[in-house]
Amino acid sequence: MARLAAFDMDGTLLMPDHHLGEKTLSTLARLRERDITLTFATGRHALEMQHILGALSLDAYLITGNGTRVHSLEGELLHRDDLPADVAELVLYQQWDTRASMHIFNDDGWFTGKEIPALLQAFVYSGFRYQIIDVKKMPLGSVTKICFCGDHDDLTRLQIQLYEALGERAHLCFSATDCLEVLPVGCNKGAALTVLTQHLGLSLRDCMAFGDAMNDREMLGSVGSGFIMGNAMPQLRAELPHLPVIGHCRNQAVSHYLTHWLDYPHLPYSPE
C-alpha cells in the first residue's frame, strides 16, 4: 500500500469552481486515518496553501510554486529553489512579442503590472490575490518563478522566444493551457517530491500521485503509482501513455478512485 499521496490542485483535486468538494475532504481524512502522508503539489503559492490548510485543519506537506518550495507539516522550509538573478532580469526586462500578462512570484507573494480581475476567479476559495507593482522595479533576488498567462497559441510562440533567449538556463513548462512558467533549471514537482521522500525516509515507489498538466509530468512519471485526470492536457497523456486515466475533476474523480482503493483494493477500478 502507498505510504504517501501527492495531489496537484487545479484540474485535479479542485473542482472547476476552484473549490474542494465534500467527498474529496472526507476521503483525505480517511487517508490520514490510515496513516498515509498527504502532500499537496501545486503551482500555487505557499502563503495561499498554508492558509487553505489552516482553514481546513488538514495536516499535509506542501510542494508549492511547482517545486520551488517544500514545507513540512509545521511550516518549516525544507527546500527552496530560485531563479538566478540574471535569468529573472532577462525575462522581466526583455520586450517579448506576446499579448500574455506577466506574473512574478517570491516569498512575499504574487506580483503583476496591472489589474486582471478575471484571474482572481481561480482564487475565490482562498482569497489570495496579486499585488500591483512596476515589474521593472521588482527585486531580482529570490524570484521563485515567472509566469505568463494568455492564449495558448500565443504562449507557444512565446515559449520559442524564451528558449532562444534563455537556452538551458531555465525550465519552461505549461502548468495549464493558458499558463507558461519560467522555473529554475531542474525544478519540478517530481524533483521536489524526491527531496521530500528522502526527508521522510521513503522512496518514490512508496508514493501515489494525481495530476492533469505538464507541470505534473515528472511527478507522475516517477512515483510508484501515477494517475492522470480525465480532463488532463492531451500532451500529458501523450507523454505518459502507460499511466491509468481516471475521471474528471468536476466529478471529484480523485475521491472516487481513492474510495475504491481504500474499500476494494483487490478489485479492478473503473472511472465510471
UniProtKB/Swiss-Prot annotation:
This is HMP-PP phosphatase. SUPFAM superfamilies: HAD-like. Its EC number is 3.6.1.-. One of its GO terms (molecular function) is magnesium ion binding. Catalyzes the hydrolysis of 4-amino-2-methyl-5-hydroxymethylpyrimidine pyrophosphate (HMP-PP) to 4-amino-2-methyl-5-hydroxymethylpyrimidine phosphate (HMP-P). Its cofactor is Mg(2+). Mg(2+) binds at D8, D10, D212. The active site is at D8 (nucleophile). Pfam families: Hydrolase_3 (PF08282).
